């Protein structure tokens, strides 16, 4: 459910982006609605509304949600202020690389890896598995950032499609692969499960 709520602003961005630009009358002012700049404005507004509602209802936002919201406000505002979509194209790469940096930093700062802080309350795994899992997330975020950057500046007609559905597809595939990997190791840290020799 949380992932769906986080996806709402991006989905609205995609819908508005795909609209044919049309002129609408708003309080006597003619505005063009549709295309990248209208979509960016919708992304900013919907992000503030969605994360604002979450903050009001839960009295907090997760760090990842704060990062996503701030990045949306910064890169979205720059896109509108300078009327250049280049700024927005950098949003996904920068956010992904900052996530990767956070996972990398947890190898050197703190007493637990970031992935263990996130999932440790629900899973019991050997330390080597936690380490491999944390590294896998680092690689995933680095790859997603690079893929978004490559598509944004190489295939400009498709970068919004990739931003929404390509990134979602990569995330789903990674989570499925992670689930398969974890299913092989969940018993390793369970003392009630007898170990078998290969």
Curated annotation (Swiss-Prot):
An example Gene Ontology CC term for this record: plasma membrane
Membrane topology: Multi-pass membrane protein
Source organism, top-level taxon: Bacteria
Compartments (UniProt record): Cell inner membrane
Cited InterPro entries: YciB
Primary localisation category: membrane
Transmembrane segments annotated in the record for this chain: 36-56, 67-87, 90-110, 135-155, 162-182
Disulfide bonds listed in the record: none
Keywords carried by this UniProt record: Cell inner membrane, Cell membrane, Membrane, Transmembrane, Transmembrane helix
Function description: Plays a role in cell envelope biogenesis, maintenance of cell envelope integrity and membrane homeostasis.
Family in the record: Belongs to the YciB family.
Name this polypeptide is given: Inner membrane-spanning protein YciB
Organism (species): Pseudomonas fluorescens (strain SBW25)
Name of the encoding gene: yciB
């Amino acid at each position: 459910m949380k992932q769906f709520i986080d996806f709402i602003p991006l989905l609205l961005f995609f819908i508005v982006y795909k609209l044919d630009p049309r002129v609408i009358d708003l309080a006597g002012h003619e505005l063009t609605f549709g295309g990248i700049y209208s979509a960016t404005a919708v992304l900013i507004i919907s992000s503030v509304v969605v994360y604002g509602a979450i903050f009001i209802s839960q009295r907090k936002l997760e760090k990842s949600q704060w990062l996503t919201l701030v990045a949306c406000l910064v890169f979205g505002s720059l896109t509108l202020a300078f009327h250049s979509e280049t700024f927005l194209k950098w949003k996904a790469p920068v956010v992904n690389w900052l996530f990767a940096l956070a996972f990398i930093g947890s190898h050197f700062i703190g007493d637990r890896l970031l992935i263990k802080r996130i999932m440790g309350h629900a899973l019991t795994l050997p330390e080597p598995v936690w380490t491999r899992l944390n590294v896998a997330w680092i690689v995933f975020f680095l790859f997603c950032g690079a893929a978004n950057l490559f598509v944004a500046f190489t295939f400009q007609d498709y970068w919004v499609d990739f931003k929404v559905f390509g990134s979602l597809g990569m995330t789903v595939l990674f989570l499925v692969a992670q689930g398969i990997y974890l299913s092989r190791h969940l018993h390793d840290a369970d003392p009630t499960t007898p170990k078998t020799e290969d």
